[in-house]
Amino acid sequence: TVLIVEDSRFICEAARLMCLHSGARLRRADSLAAARRHLNVYFPTIVIIDVGLPDGSGLQLISELAGASPRIGVILGTSGDDLMNHQSLKAGADGFLAKPFENLSCFQSTILQLLPVEQKPKGPIVLQDAPVLPDLITFRDDLVQALISLKDYLSSKEEGFIRSFLARVCAASGDDYMQEAIKTGYIDQLCAKIEHRIGQIAIL
């Protein structure tokens, strides 16, 4: 079982498809609080933790799990910022997955090489390189959540987090229109562009 701690539904869907291709089952937690509730009940084989989460830094959870006993077999940090690779390893992660998750064979090989010997698949391993194409509905869901958050935000720090979330999701989806829209300085203009894109996806 793989637990992913990630607030983007689109990125989680990409991970779910990769796990499906790999014969693994994925569970999702969208925050540190949700992850801790999950870990109180389940003990996953692998946990993938986004460094930037709505209620705090994923590095904190990585550090907690790395020092826990018994220890989860594989702890991975993930981020759209490659500089977080070093920070994740420093916190105690076994490895790092860069976003967006696009290459299935890279996803599989990263996990396989870190699995404890007793948990590695027996026999020859054929890495797959099938395309991973998450449903656009999950991308729309992320845009809707970002739009709601932008309209309710209370501080520049919250605005920065929402823009960072949008940047990660739009890069993962390859949406050039939205990647350009994020550069808009005014909140009302950005909200209008998000609403426009949501409407376009609904028509598809």
What are these regions (language model features)?
Residues 31, 57-60:
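Acidic catalytic/metal-coordinating carboxylates
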Residues 59-71:
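Short amphipathic alpha-helix used as the core "switch/output" element in two-component signaling
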